Amino acid sequence: MSDLTKFNKFFLTPNKLNAFLRVIGLCGLFSVIAISFGIYSYTRNEIPNIASLFLIVLGSVVLFLAFVIHFAALFKRNKLLKKVNKENRTNLWQKEMGNFKAIESFEFFEQGPISSDILPSFYPTALYNFEPLPRQFKVTYKDGSEFVFGHIYAIKRSSNKTEKVACLIAITPAINSENHFFLTDANYSLNKNVAQFEALTENKKQENISLFVEKDSNFSFQNLDTEVLNKVLFNPLNVYAKFNVYNDTVHTYLFMSVPTTFMDTKLKVNEAFDDLVTNIKLQASYDFKTLNSMQKVVDLLHNKLIKKPESKSSSQKSVETEIEKEVKDKLAKN
């Protein structure tokens, strides 16, 4: 990490810098009062003109210096922030993630298996500009399970200020190897120009959910667990995360909205430089919880989303066996 002098660290310590700027602000306020009193006295001749002029000049000089010092301090802080944030501290974040007992290893990919055109529908491409390629990594847990994740940013188009959103993508073996489908919000219009979605021509709707499938496919909401759909994936009361599920018979992609601070190791304006390592530890802790939440949803997809064929009870089987015997006996007699 960057080694900064005490002088530079002062500008990256919000408590100290803000206290200094408040003092400068008070000096500016008193200078305005002095200028106002000087002008008032000069026009009313209540004190000698030389004293009034002195107050006006002194107040003007102090006000100018207060403005220059305030501007210079903020400029210096922003310049140092940019310098500090040019450093890539992902290795520190990765090290902290690896310290959690549940994680065996954490590996980043130069170029992972998630393609750049696999994008979430809850941030439509008409409204957001997405990063060209997700940042991808593999997490191996001590229980033997492995997950490949992609993390992608998008910035809102035609916005006066930078509005970022972020999404996490988990790729796993297909939860259903026979059906090609996409689960999303009911109001979403599928972009058929995307290669993955080209074959999905049928749209089945149920309340606030859309299920896109291939033409003549028998796959429907009857094959899906209602509780997982309504209470987890598309719960309107869940304001913390939005989900999509895309299954292409080889892989399943789970999309989940995450805070823009996910994997963010940059120093913020309201954070002190000396607390940077501590803040990265805290960020890793939040991100670990996010990955755990996503892991639980992935487990639900694999274990519960697709309804399993109902097995016949032993009584049903015995009744069917008796009927079969009766039919065979009748056929034998005939």
Curated annotation (Swiss-Prot):
Where does this protein come from, organism-wise?
Mycoplasma genitalium (strain ATCC 33530 / DSM 19775 / NCTC 10195 / G37) (Mycoplasmoides genitalium)
Record GO cellular component, one term: plasma membrane
Q: Where in the cell is it found?
A: Cell membrane
**Membrane-spanning segments:** 19-39, 55-75
Keyword Transmembrane helix assigned: yes
Q: Where is this region: Disordered?
A: 308-334
Designated name of the protein: Uncharacterized protein MG456
What membrane topology does the UniProt entry give?
A: Multi-pass membrane protein
- Ranges of compositional bias, category Basic and acidic residues: 319-334
